[in-house]
């Protein structure tokens, strides 16, 4: 484990990055507004799992492929952007669909297939910039003299993911009640889901158009 000085510096830097608005926070915010606190919390759990995937990938050296291969980076980036756009389109198409608890068996099955945890996982896994972030940020706080580099990397990476998730959950707490209010009114729900869908599409287009290694 890194020494206390490195840990303190890492914690401050990771906390500042966690509370800085970015695609992850905006994604969780959109899901919270669309489905209330429960959907936002489950989406946060999904992005948490996706973040841990990137931590392990970076620790094992797999993420280095994205850093060295422009083709691999572009493929993952555009796949992630396409997935966000797909979610946005689906949200617009189903803006007038009943909540799963009131829907029939077929609609419940469809809702399960669109589970926010799985969507959160894929949204984070298909974000190559998360991989590059861990490759560039975490190594600055790894102390080679202390050895156990893999364990240090995983510990620091997991800590960063936890801080990001706590920031996401804070967003859920504020946005969730507003989302539940929308869910109680069919007209508001329809309009809000349409607006959220457009926001997801916009986020996907932003990811696709952004500079690859910024």
Task: Annotate each predicted stretch with a short phrase.
Residues 74, 87-130, 177-198, 210-214:
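Alpha-helical multi-pass membrane helix bundles of inner-membrane/thylakoid proteins
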Residues 56, 76-83, 129, 133, ...:
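Residue-level signal for the membrane-embedded core of alpha-helical transmembrane segments
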Residues 5-6, 206-214:
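Juxtamembrane boundary at the C-terminal end of a transmembrane helix
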Residues 2-74, 136-156, 160-161, 172-179:
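Juxtamembrane transmembrane-helix termini in multi-pass membrane transport proteins
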Residues 15, 19, 52-53, 79, ...:
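Hydrophobic/aromatic residues within the transmembrane alpha-helices of Major Facilitator Superfamily
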Residues 38-116, 174, 205:
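Membrane helix-loop-helix hairpins that form the core translocation module of multi-pass transporters
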Residues 87-91, 161-169:
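Transmembrane alpha-helical segments that form the membrane-embedded catalytic/substrate-channel core
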